[in-house]
Amino acid sequence: MRALIQRVLEAKVEVDGQTTGEIKKGLLVFLGLGKEDTLEKGQKLIDKILKYRIFDDEQGKMGWNVSQANGGVLLVSQFTLMAQTQKGLRPDFGPAMPPSDAKALYEQLVEYTRSQFENVQTGIFAADMKVHLINDGPVTFNLT
């Protein structure tokens, strides 16, 4: 499981010209699920993301998490994060969880995230999404 998180001033996801999720300040989270991933592993990663201190505190240091910064979370599934890229010139998506299993786990993780944090928006699993964002920093981290 991999999460690419970006601190944003705003972000939104569109599918077929319709906005499916939108936040102002907060975290844009791209989430990739691998064959061996579990709900428990995902919950631990979500907890880490929600507690990860990458927002400026009163001293201008990265001391606040998304809740303390009064931000939102935009959660977007992205199987390409699981690609093996060490060999050749074409990504190998073999390590990614099969779509039917990944959809079920992704939906459980969305539900879990919403149980832990109030302002959670999402894309649509496996849809052709257009993601618009304004990076803040930029500040980007790859969490596993």
From Swiss-Prot:
One of its GO terms (molecular function) is Gly-tRNA(Ala) deacylase activity. GO terms for biological process: D-amino acid catabolic process. GO terms for cellular component: cytoplasm. Signal peptide: none annotated. The keyword Phosphoprotein does not apply. It is found in: Cytoplasm. Coiled coil: none annotated. A motif (Gly-cisPro motif, important for rejection of L-amino acids) lies at residues 137-138. Its EC number is 3.1.1.96. It catalyses: glycyl-tRNA(Ala) + H2O = tRNA(Ala) + glycine + H(+); a D-aminoacyl-tRNA + H2O = a tRNA + a D-alpha-amino acid + H(+). The keyword Membrane does not apply. Keywords: Cytoplasm, Hydrolase, RNA-binding, tRNA-binding. Belongs to the DTD family. PANTHER family: D-AMINOACYL-TRNA DEACYLASE 1 (PTHR10472:SF5), D-TYROSYL-TRNA TYR DEACYLASE (PTHR10472). An aminoacyl-tRNA editing enzyme that deacylates mischarged D-aminoacyl-tRNAs. Also deacylates mischarged glycyl-tRNA(Ala), protecting cells against glycine mischarging by AlaRS. Acts via tRNA-based rather than protein-based catalysis; rejects L-amino acids rather than detecting D-amino acids in the active site. By recycling D-aminoacyl-tRNA to D-amino acids and free tRNA molecules, this enzyme counteracts the toxicity associated with the formation of D-aminoacyl-tRNA entities in vivo and helps enforce protein L-homochirality. A Gly-cisPro motif from one monomer fits into the active site of the other monomer to allow specific chiral rejection of L-amino acids. Homodimer. This is D-aminoacyl-tRNA deacylase. It comes from Acinetobacter baumannii (strain SDF).
